[in-house]
Design a protein with these regions (language model features):
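A structural signal for repeat-array scaffolds
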Residues: 101, 107, 322, 363-365, ...
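Conserved P-loop NTPase "ATPase switch" module shared by AAA+ and STAND
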Residues: 199-222
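Conserved adenine-nucleotide phosphate-binding loops and their immediately adjacent elements
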Residues: 103-130
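Conserved NTP-binding/hydrolysis module of P-loop NTPases
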Residues: 177-196
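Alpha-helical sensor/transducer elements of the RecA-like P-loop NTPase core
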Residues: 123-126, 152, 224-298, 310, ...
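Walker A/P-loop nucleotide-binding motif
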Residues: 137-154
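C-terminal boundary/linker of central alpha/beta nucleotide-binding cores
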Residues: 65-69, 313-381, 389
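A short hydrophobic beta-strand->loop->alpha-helix junction that borders the nucleotide-binding pocket
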Residues: 168-178
Length: 731
């Protein structure tokens, strides 16, 4: 709704809209070296939903009247060249102060990368219809051609929900987005990763969940996101999924489809340059089918498009050809990238300003990418040889940079140049996965499609197992050569699915084919996993006896001499833990003595073992005050995040009423990153989610759902089953 004049002369609407947008930024930016892109001419035009030429007349009038001022400044994320930016003056603010905004209800809260609001033209009926459906509790798939304005309409609907006090959780998809990534956008860092836990944490009445750009999902992750939407469909929140037709998951169950078409002729006119006469405007709008992006890209200096000319053909024949060589080079670099880029990341920055001035780029903060229609048209114009050459050049360029993101980019371009390098993947995939396992999964999936190398498929299977993706892991395991490696992965898959008996049978078969040293290592790893495969609390005596007998049966002498001490250490740690839990003081003392002899009395780990012994002696369900004081000091002194978490968990287990310092200590490590490629860390992560459910009872169900998922990912099916039982009893 337009503001109403309370006193004084009314400014033209175009000028009022400019002033209202500029007034959202503080006066301190008038002398700032770096200013937001929204104050640049392309950013201002974008937010107002007009072409840049439509700003010239109202801006000139506002500047002549002293309502705005212009200067050259560096635009954040826009490269090194200074650009013209616009500021509202005190006089401009005074002019706005005479305007009275309609009263609004308390504004709701938004989460995630919610785009900047822009003014829509000719979409009032669509916005009202879509808003009415969502606010009434429906779930909707918003579909349409690329560039037709789906995201802009979704943003307008989100604004309507916010103005009515709703909570809006927004996620935008890319090729590396998975269900867990959507959860982080909806809920923030530390969000759960399983679909059921994500929905449990984000669901609520008067809540709108938005999933934008769903067509960008890689097939590797589409099924997981579809599962997320299936989980959300019957819940309290309304869900808006936005996708180019057809969507990667069809029309989800419980969703209705809302197809967005081109603009009507009377509304298309407002997107053309202001100096376009009415006859030309009608012909152009009809020729381009009312397509909003194509209309914004048309210039009055160009020929009127042929009637019936497809929008894609118009983009290729006209928009692309008007670019300079520098603009085309920068556009190609954007188009081959797997994700949006900062301008500072470009190797060919010269054409970035030209692309921005031409309304070819879309922005999210400082990250930019071409509008997807333009990107798709440009990609489609390349021959296979041209595409291969571009990717090969980009791979070489990114190889000169450091860091996991650079390796992700290098890997993408290497694979898409048709030359997946198994040795390179083996060397770098863990660093990529540690920063973004979803990106690593996509990279491996692309490499598997192009290479017959067994090691690449093994890496793809291992990553799927670590991520808890049973179906994907199985598809890769089935294509591996028969042997020990395949059997061990099949055993992991069985445990992931909760079939411990089959897993044990497969492992026994695999061990029969191992060397004695390999068999010993596998036995120790199995013992450690079985010891951890339970919820916090006293160990079952039967399990304790089984593990003790199994530990005593391990033949350490079969290991190479250099590895025997670490093998003995692992077994003695298990013996010590079991003895403490069942109250077997003599056995605990023997294990402690063996550990002290192996590590030395002054080793930092001995202090931890001594503390565990003191914590095991409890009165009334709680460890002594002296033991808790020592625990607090030891926790605060530990820098290793894994060790600190294990200590915190040990103290939580030793107390029925948890002191404030302990609760705060756990909160401080609740979202600290752990390595998914390490089995020990996967188990630790599952236990951490369990304790979050204990300490945060209002979110217990969501946290424990995630804990169940994490226990399965850690191959702890017994702990997962036990926790499911506790959840059922709690409900």
């Amino acid at each position: 709704m337009n503001p109403c004049l309370r006193s004084g002369a009314m400014l033209p609407e175009a000028q009022l809209r400019i002033l209202a947008r500029l007034a959202q930024f503080g006066g301190e930016l008038e002398k700032a070296w770096d200013v937001p892109r929204a104050l640049s001419l392309p950013g201002l035009a974008e937010s107002l939903g007009v072409v840049r030429s439509a700003l010239h007349a109202p801006l000139s009038a506002l500047e002549a009247d002293g309502h705005v001022s212009t200067r050259s400044a560096h635009v954040i994320g826009g490269g090194t060249r200074r650009r013209t930016v616009v500021h509202i003056t005190d006089r401009g603010r005074e002019a706005l102060s005479g305007l009275e905004e309609p009263s609004r209800a308390r504004r709701g809260r938004s989460f995630g990368p919610l785009p900047e609001p822009i003014s829509l033209h000719g979409r009032e009926e669509d916005a009202t219809s879509l808003s009415d459906s969502l606010l009434a509790g429906s779930n909707v798939l918003l579909s349409g051609l690329p560039g037709v304005g789906k995201s802009s309409l979704a943003r307008a609907v989100a604004e309507q929900a916010l103005s009515m006090g709703w909570t809006v959780r927004w996620a935008s998809c890319g090729s590396d987005t998975d269900a867990a990534g959507i959860g982080r956008m909806w809920l923030g860092e530390g969000a759960p990763s399983s679909p059921s836990a994500i929905i449990g944490a984000s669901d609520g009445t008067r809540t709108l969940l938005v999933l934008d750009e769903a067509q960008e999902l890689h097939p590797r992750h589409a099924a997981g996101v579809a599962e997320l939407l299936d989980e959300a469909s019957p819940e309290s929140s309304s869900v808006l999924a936005v996708s180019r037709s057809p969507s990667p998951f069809g029309i989800p169950e419980g969703f209705s489809e809302f197809k967005l078409e081109g603009l009507a002729l009377e509304h298309a006119r407002s997107l053309l340059p202001s100096d376009t006469d009415s006859t030309t405007a009608r012909v152009v709008a009809e020729a381009l089918g009312g397509h909003p992006l194509a209309l914004r890209l048309w210039s009055s200096d160009e020929e009127v498009p042929e009637r019936g000319e497809a929008v894609q053909e118009y983009i290729e024949s006209t928009v692309m050809r008007r670019l300079s060589d520098e603009g085309t080079g920068t556009l190609d670099e954007f188009c081959i990238s797997p994700s949006s880029l900062e301008v500072s990341e470009l190797f060919e920055t010269e054409g970035a300003d030209e692309l921005d001035d031409s309304a070819i780029l879309r922005w999210s903060g400082v990250m930019a990418e071409p509008h997807h229609l333009i990107r798709n048209v440009r990609r489609g114009s390349w021959s296979d040889e041209q595409s291969t050459a571009l990717h090969s050049q980009a791979a070489g360029r990114w190889a000169t940079r450091q860091g996991a993101r650079a390796r992700r980019m290098e890997g993408h371009h290497m694979v898409n140049s048709g030359e997946p390098d198994a040795e390179w993947i083996s060397e770098h995939i863990h660093a990529i996965a540690e920063q973004d396992s979803a990106a690593a999964a996509v990279l491996l999936e692309q490499a598997v499609d192009l290479s017959e190398d067994e090691s690449i498929r093994e890496a793809a299977a291992d990553l799927a197992l670590e991520r808890g993706e049973a179906g994907i892991a199985e598809s890769h395991i089935e294509d591996l050569r028969v042997g020990v490696g395949r059997k061990l992965r099949s055993a992991r898959l069985a445990r992931l699915r909760g079939d411990s008996r089959s897993a044990e049978d497969i492992e026994v078969s695999a061990r029969a084919e191992m060397t004695p040293a390999e068999r010993t290592k596998a036995s120790i790893a199995s013992l450690v996993r079985r010891y951890d495969d339970r919820l916090p609390g006293r160990i079952d005596r039967r399990l304790a006896q089984e593990l003790t007998r199994a530990a005593d049966a391990v033949d350490i002498s079969s290991l190479p001499e250099s590895e025997r001490s670490s093998g003995s250490l692992a077994l003695d740690l298990i013996r010590h833990g079991i003895a403490l839990e069942i109250g077997d003081v003599p056995s605990a003392a023997r294990a402690h003595s063996a550990l002290e002899s192996a590590m030395g009395p002054d080793h930092p780990s001995m202090a931890v073992l001594d503390l565990r012994a003191r914590l095991s002696s409890r009165v009334g369900g709680n460890a002594s005050a002296e033991a808790l004081s020592s625990a607090q000091s030891l926790i605060e002194s530990r820098e290793d995040i894994g060790e600190r978490i294990r200590l915190i968990h040990a103290v939580l287990e030793a107390t029925d009423s948890h002191p404030d310092w302990l609760v705060e200590a756990h909160a401080s490590v609740a979202i600290a990153p752990l390595r998914e490629d390490l089995a020990m860390h996967r188990r630790l992560c599952a236990q951490r989610w369990y304790w979050r459910g204990v300490l945060e009872p209002d979110r217990r169900l969501s946290h424990w759902r995630e804990a169940v998922s994490r226990f399965r990912m850690a191959e702890c099916s017994a702990a997962a089953t036990e926790l499911i039982g506790r959840m059922a009893r709690a409900i």
